[in-house]
Amino acid sequence: MSHRAFWFAARLTAVVAVVFLPTPSSGQTPVPAGAIAAPTEDDILRFKMPTVTVTAQKEPEDRQKVPVSVTAVTRETIDAAGIRLVSEAAILSPNTIFTESTARKLSSARVRGIGSSPNNPAVTTYLDGVPQLNANSSSVELLDVDRIEFVRGPQSALFGRNALGGLINVVSSRPSMAGWTGSLALPFANYGAWTVRGGVSGPVLKDRLAIGFSAAQVSRDGFTINDVTGHDLDSRSAFSVKGQALWVPAANWEARVIVTGEHARDGDYGLHDVAALRANPFHAARDFEGSTDRGIVGTTIQVRRSGGPLVFSSTTGIVKWTTRDRTDLDYTLQPLLQRDNAEEDLQFTQELRVASAEQAPIALSDSAHLRWQAGVFLFSQGYQQDAVNSFSPFVVAPFPVSQHSPRSALDDDGVGLFGQATVTLATRFDVSAGARFDHESKDATLETFYEPQIAPPSRVDAEKGFSSVSPQVSAAWRVGSAHTLYGTVGRGFKAGGFNAASPAGREAYDEEQTWNIEGGVKTEWAGGRVTANAAVFHIDWDDLQLNVPDPAVPAQFFIANVGGATSNGVELEIAARAAPGLDLFTAIGYTKARFGAGSVSGPIGIEGNLVPFTPDYTVSVGAQYSRLVGTATVHGRVDVARSGAFQYDEANSLGQDAYTLVHLRGGYTARRWLAEVFVRNAFDTAYIPFALPYPNLAPSGFLGEMGAPRTFGASVGVRF
């Protein structure tokens, strides 16, 4: 069977399974994630805001009680807003943005100004407890997701490496033990967009074994037109799948296996000169039209034993991804330079953890109790890249020349030991202290050479180790049952490493460290109908790692330590159940992040400059309304997101002005059937959220991609 025939058969099998798999009924059963459940009259008339449980500190806790800034996007919000990617949910979290292009592999989260290279993220995405050590595998289609947690501020004391800016925790819905359920949805939109999404879930052995399966095929035409050929450049097409099994072999024991996969075959990057894009949006001109492909397979195994005074848990993760992108590297009409870049990565992670049970804290006295957790984390990662730059005749020689820049192999192994203890005094005052020790060993083989050999090849073999201790202390005071005041001080850590490609002598970079001071308040008002949370923070960076361009090689970037920086800001989140069926919400963030004294990037002094891709403010406001009409439900939602101005590079030579996006969605649900209409970027705002320095070849000095234009469509679906 050919490669293409295999994937066609896989897609057909997935859709047939979703539609025709037997689904025996067992009374009233929950609707699986991905379907929009018709709310009952009790749901709509309920005034109190729901309690949301998060695992921002590994153990389940009420979002309003945990002394951490966290925004939880629940399954209900994911469905109501039509969220299909983590980056789409980020507008609901203050001071959180994604630096990403339409290519799936380029997507990096930034929180409070902290963010860096996809190869060494400062804000790590956890998919069902498994950290994505390279951001390449983190931007995936959301299937059967129960919630997304945006945790802001350093979490290194518990999560270790690459969490000094925060973390994003994506949690899948559990397979249903109660009865079989399923859903199928068919959205379609302009730009030739169409999607088939579906899922089933239910028990195989009563109270012992349940399974779940979901899949999606998502495709659209490109937004950007190549004026040379008239073709659209940046088309997208991907098939995603998730399978789960939940096994309860005995009381207090459970095991869960989650397998995910993605097969993406996309068009080219929509990159073009920024000045030209602003004059003529969604148009480019190049002689070669390329492609960007990605494949991901991930397996997660979770085992948990509860009951008694201790809780034991194990999370094992294996993630394998490959990418290949072919593009016109000069991004001009001239046949000068093309790039064929292949990357692959295999990671293994294992965490073992023990914690005191919530119902069995250790009594220190009549008014003092202790809760604790401790664990060990192991990982191994192997990354390989072979990027071939093909020069046309008379560019570097009178004949065609290929340059492998780089051909590299990076291996990384590490261990982390962590613990946290929380003492509760008189049921109202918590004092917590935690710390984590991390050690990593890194090896690199870095090669650059030409075919034919017009210059001597270079090869670097290097190894280096990094160790760090990351402490954190916090205090929380519960004022009555509805309000919590808290303060935290913590250190963040991101290991150093090796660049797959860089100028000679810049192959290695050092670790980055931060100290974070934060104070906040979490409150409930009007009998639980209103929640209002606020935080202020101050961050000090040392040896900040920044992704900077290689002046000698187009589109090649490397990580460099550029000096220090500070970030100061405030955040406010308010949600209110204003009337039966009516929810109002807002999230506001302000950040001032600047480079410190003595900071330099190459030959350029950047002291006092703004940290790139850090808007000075983010604002999100919205409303959601549901109403019963007979036995059916009508619903509508509006989201308005505004981003402040930000810079594209550390030299602050070009940036994006403030812009506003408006998203609308509404629908009608009757018994098993659902119909919706939607508009994203309703006012067709033109903006360039992603741009990179490109001296010599781009007239403005920058290549950029337009943000998505106005898209609109409809969706029909069925639940069974």
Placement of each model-derived feature along the sequence:
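Gram-negative outer-membrane beta-barrel transporters
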Residues: 355, 359-364, 375, 427, ...
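N-terminal Sec signal peptide and the immediately downstream disordered periplasmic leader
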Residues: 1-83, 87-95, 251-252, 299, ...
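N-terminal periplasmic accessory domains that precede
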Residues: 86-89, 108-113, 126, 150, ...
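Transmembrane beta-barrel wall of Gram-negative outer-membrane proteins
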Residues: 181, 188-220, 224, 228-267, ...
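Short acidic/polar hinge/loop motifs at secondary-structure boundaries
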Residues: 128-154, 171
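Membrane-embedded beta-barrel scaffold of Gram-negative outer-membrane proteins
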Residues: 302-329, 478, 484-490, 510-570, ...
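Extracytoplasmic beta-strand/coil segments of soluble accessory domains associated
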Residues: 55, 87-130, 146
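C-terminal beta-signal and adjacent terminal beta-strands/loops
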Residues: 540, 641-649, 668-720
